[in-house]
Regions:
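Residue-level preference for long, well-ordered alpha-helices that form the structural scaffold
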Residues: 60-71, 121
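GST superfamily/GST-like fold recognition
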Residues: 44, 48, 93-118, 131-134, ...
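Long hydrophobic alpha-helical segments typical of transmembrane helices together
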Residues: 121-150
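Surface-exposed helix-capping loop/turn segments at secondary-structure junctions
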Residues: 16, 81-94, 137-141
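GST-like domain detector, emphasizing the conserved glutathione-binding G-site
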Residues: 1-63
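Amphipathic alpha-helical packing segments from all-alpha helical-bundle domains
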Residues: 66-85
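All-alpha amphipathic helical-bundle segments outside canonical DNA-binding/catalytic cores
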Residues: 19-29, 68, 88-101
């Protein structure tokens, strides 16, 4: 039921390009980036939290948007700092092929755009997101490409 565990399971059991680097240091870095997104940024900005803010706490839409924008900015600032200028950051979060980290980054930026978060302060993240968007696998996984998309 946890996305990172499912992705790692599929990576280990299915043929195709690996989503984790071959070296232990690279794997640790990719996991740190992915977990930073999945464990630090996403949980406080998911739909369940926003519904609780509005329902149980009576937050207005403006207050929920302020919450979302604040926490997304805080998380993306840290992620941009982690990736920008790092010698292993290349076309993607780690190297020149997509990794588990990129699989986490792309949906987080999709959600940030959905909530009209300004993203200009994150040029490294935007560059990586654009590189992912060029790939058929990311195009096919995009929310709008799903059968149940509205």
């Amino acid at each position: 039921t946890q996305s990172l565990a499912i992705i790692e399971y599929l990576d280990e059991t299915q043929p195709g390009p690996a989503l984790l680097p071959a070296d232990a240091v690279g794997r640790a870095r990719v996991r740190a980036i992915a977990q930073g997104i999945a464990c630090d940024i996403h949980p406080i900005n998911n739909l369940r939290v926003l519904q609780y803010l509005g329902g149980q706490l009576g937050a207005t839409q403006e207050q929920k948007d302020a919450w979302y924008h604040h926490w997304i900015a805080t998380g993306l600032q840290g992620l941009e700092a982690m990736l920008a200028g790092h010698p292993d950051t290349d076309r993607f979060c780690h190297g020149d092929t997509p990794t588990l980290a990129d699989c986490c980054l792309v949906p987080q930026l999709f959600n940030a755009r959905r909530f009209n978060c300004p993203l200009d302060a994150y040029p490294t993240l935007l560059r990586i997101d654009a590189a992912c968007a060029e790939l058929p696998a990311f195009q096919q996984a995009a929310p709008g490409a799903q059968a149940d998309a509205e």
